[in-house]
């Protein structure tokens, strides 16, 4: 009858990729729904295997903008008077926690030397800018409601302000529901109350690092289809997607 799907981005991931990072501008790159949630839409469409008939969507950039900056804020976190109290601090995310260091080239292996180099990058790139003073225009919360053929409904939320990541899905049928995330799925039978649990660690599978296999899978299909001049290798067509 219905599906609920959540894509929780995590607050520091959103700040890194969609406020400071390469995808900070929907106008220059692509909207958040495509940049972050295209695989999620594919999952919903694949589960239902029906054409979507109607869509309503709402989203906005509500938090990461100038009027929400704290007193004492500066253009860069290095110069900010309240940096130590900010969960989005570039010093906290990159220097102290060493997250997302793949964006910085030629970092030394030695921890002290590495931190010095990271701080140099933060002085000269967007990754060191205040999240309230960046050139971002991506929405930081987004909801989408869809009606599919046979009156089946689905809702999807894409949220910046979450403490954890990983897709979460609830499928509601007439005889049971299924609740799951990126690792565990639980089916509960309405009549008997019996639960069936699937617990599978897929993190070691090829290509998992690319959005849990989504990037790897779609490119594999595309390359095989082009190389063999045969669309049978495609798990989905452009019309469906």
Task: For every predicted segment, state its role.
Residues 138-241:
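C-terminal helical cap and adjacent loop that interface with cofactors, partners, or active-site loops
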Residues 133:
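A surface/extracellular/periplasmic glyco- and lipid-processing/surface-interacting theme
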Residues 36, 136-139:
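A generic fold-level signal
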